[in-house]
Regions:
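Flexible, compositionally biased loop and terminal segments
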Residues: 1-245
Length: 245
């Protein structure tokens, strides 16, 4: 496993996005209910955020709860919403200590009022922090995001000939956030699950078999080290990139 000291800090991805997969399977392996896996995942979140701060990552987006997750058993959904409130209450002090700003993206009106209120309180308390921005994707799906962006464009009377990539980007939830440089997905699945589809056009993907509750700072370093081994071309040839064109 790579250590933080082994990472070239001048080539750290500015924005790391993470699909935190495997909580339920981890819990079943421990012969517990799925919610136990979500509760145990908080250690992985804390370790990963603190690791990102130490590495110099400026933005980290965690796929926390998708719009499709509303279809899960009601007891699990209710437990997740309560866990979200508890996590925010417990971690605000740590976010302040690490100078991390918290923000959210997604269809937030679907969240229970108590969950939304506590999240907004934490966002207000941390809004002046500058070391890292931690983005929680809550009640989020990329297709929903793109659809709501198009609705806003139509509502403002913008004509088709005046719509380009930058227009659409302006109306996305992430308009003030750079696109992810690196996507990490834990749990062994090889898909992006309706997450940041527009934003990940040139993102490097890293998949690991590690279930999310077992993910630690050294695992984050492994992903970043693999990212640093790759050549990002953005449509150019290898020769052009090496020539600095």
């Amino acid at each position: 496993m790579a250590k933080i000291e082994e990472i070239d800090k001048t080539r750290v991805p500015q924005h790391v996005a993470i699909i935190m997969d495997g909580n339920g399977r981890w819990a079943m392996k421990q012969q517990h209910e799925r919610l136990f896996g979500h509760q145990s995942a908080l250690t992985a979140v804390r370790q990963t955020v603190e690791g990102g701060v130490r590495l110099g990552v400026k933005y980290m987006t965690l796929y926390t709860f998708s719009t499709e997750n509303w279809n899960r058993p009601q007891a699990e959904v209710d437990g997740l919403m309560e866990l979200l409130v508890k996590a925010v209450l417990d971690e605000t002090e740590t976010l302040m200590k690490n100078n991390v700003r918290l923000t959210m993206i997604g269809d937030l009106q679907r969240l229970p009022e108590r969950s939304r209120t506590m999240m907004e309180r934490c966002m207000t308390e941390t809004e002046g922090n500058t070391t890292m921005t931690l983005i929680l994707a809550l009640s989020y799906s990329s297709r929903w995001e793109i659809a709501q962006a198009l609705k806003k464009i139509c509502a403002e009377g913008i004509t088709p000939e005046n719509v380009d990539e930058e227009t659409l980007r302006h109306y996305l939830c992430t308009s003030d956030i750079p696109d992810p440089d690196l996507l990490i997905r834990t749990g062994g699945e090889l898909r992006v699950s309706n997450f940041l589809l527009w934003q990940m056009a040139y993102t490097e993907f890293y998949f690991t078999e590690i279930l999310w509750p077992d993910f630690r700072q050294d695992d984050l370093c492994d992903a970043v080290l693999e990212f640093q081994r790759r050549q990002r071309r953005f449509g150019k040839t290898e020769a052009q990139v090496e020539a600095g064109e």
